[in-house]
C-alpha cells in the first residue's frame, strides 16, 4: 500500500501512525509513510510537494494499492497540473487508487479526462486508525476493501426501507457507477473536471456528505437537478449524510424533507435509493468509480454488483 497526502494535514498526528501500525500487523507493506508528517498551513505539504506526489503515481508498480491519508481540502489547487493520461495508463496496467471526501475531485477529474476507474473507499486516518479505545477498523469496510483490491469485485445486498421509491417499486438498472462527496461534485459543475452528460448518461450516481445541514444538501441537489445531472441518471444512490445539526427554526424540516423535495421533481423512472453504506462513516463499501454496475431494488432494499 502506497500512501499519499494530497489534501489536508492530519488533525491528530497519532492517527496516521496508528493506521500504519494496524495495516503492518495485517501483513501489509506500507510505503511512502513520510507523507503523513507533512504540514503546510492547513495542507499536507506545499502545493508543489502534493502535486509531485500525485504525479508520481504514474510511475508506481501495478501491484500497488494507493490510499489517501485523509480528505479536507487541497486537491482543487492541483487539478490543472495533474498528469491525467500518465496516471490513467498506470491504472490500465493494474494500479488501484482509493479515497473519498476531497479525493472525489481527483476521481471525477480523472474520469472526465480519461475514463479511468478508481476506488471510492477507505482512507488511512479515519478508517484504519483509533476509533474509541482501540484500533478496530470496521470489519465490513475491511472485507469489502480487500474484495475490491484482490478480486476487483463489488457485491453487496443492503436491507433498508426505501421511502423515496416511486412506482414501480421494484426494478433493475445498469450503468456507470460514479459520484462521491456531494459538496465536491456540485463544485465541479461547469468545470472540465466533471464528467460530461455523454459520459454519465444512464449512470448510477452515488452521493454522500458530512457536516452539511439538510437545506444545504437540498440546495446542492437542486443545483445538480437544474444542471441536468440528476435526470441524466438511471438511478441515484444516497449514502451517509452525517454530523449535521437541526435547529428550532427548521420546524420539522429534515434530511428526508430535503430529499423528497428533489425526488418529486425527478422523472418517475429514476429510483432514488437510500441506505448505501458509504460516506464519512465506519461502515463503508469500496465503490469502483467509472465501472459498470448493476442494481436490483424493491421497497425493502437493493443489491449492487460490479466487476472491473
Per-segment meaning from a language model:
Residues 1-62:
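ATP/NTP phosphate-donor binding region
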Residues 10-16, 172-208:
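Conserved beta-alpha junction segments in alpha/beta enzyme cores
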Residues 62-63, 88-96, 116, 233-234, ...:
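A short helix->loop->beta-strand "cap" motif at the edges of active sites that frequently abuts
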Residues 65-76, 80-81, 100:
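N-terminal glycine-rich "phosphate-gripper" loop used for MgATP/nucleotide binding
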Residues 84-109, 117-124:
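Short, acidic/small-residue loops that bind anionic groups at enzyme active sites
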Residues 115-184:
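Conserved anion/nucleotide-ligand pocket segment
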Residues 196-255:
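Internal helical hairpin/lid segments
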Residues 238-308:
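ATP/nucleoside-binding phosphotransfer catalytic cores, i.e., glycine-rich phosphate-binding loops
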